[in-house]
Amino acid sequence: ATAHYYMTVMYLIKAARMVGNEFDVRYYSSLAYDIMVAFNKRFLDSNTAQYGTGSQASNALPIFLQMIQSTGDKGDYTPDASLTAKVLTNLIKDVESHGNRLTTGDVGNRYLIQTLARNGQHELIYKMFNHEEAPGYGFQLKFGATTLTEQWDPRQGSSWNHFMMGQIDEWFFNSLIGIRPSTTLSASVNEKDEPMQGYQKFVIAPKLVGDLKYVKSTYETLYGTILVDWTRQNGTFTLNVSVPVNTTAIVYLPGEKELKEVQSGTYKFVAAE
């Protein structure tokens, strides 16, 4: 609850900046800092780099919100990079110790998945869900589910039509497909950055994981439909993209540092894996 309180206040700061209300910016900035300090004082064990009970949700949430800080001047929200790395290591170890399975519930699922994604742990996410055991989507499919079920094990008699386990969709679009709004008018591929509103300029940076050979999807924007279609075959990566009119795409091919900036149209890119 305290972490979500902090997140809400950070949104109020953003809203105040958007409308030019400097008084509210100062007021809520001070409040957010006090919340962050109180949160770390109450829940962080700096000796072990664990939050609360050390569960996946307990450690993922403060990493996601970038509120891990041991010291700092009032109004400074810069996370402690060293301490954050240690908490992330504990989080990864916990996932691995459970056989690459999650222990989070509905509230914590998104924070776990996105914390791992934003820190480059795409292979681990793939392992977490590419199986037919509970907890996992494959287990639901195994028992004939055509919509998300309320429980990971649909045999428990709960609802067979629940959206609350759908947080994986964000990883599908932002990472596997790789479509994200650009964070600035210049190129950016940092998944931790705050995105700009709209898709007049966007990033296509697909992540290749495991034995996944084919991904195709469309994304509807105010400017039109973005299409991404990629395949892996015999060591060759092929990417087809469709960029809507009056938009610009910044394309990153796996393994290549040089970006490709393209205007509206249809394009094909080929690269070695």
Show where each model-derived region lies:
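Catalytic cores of carbohydrate-active enzymes
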Residues: H4-W160, T266, V270
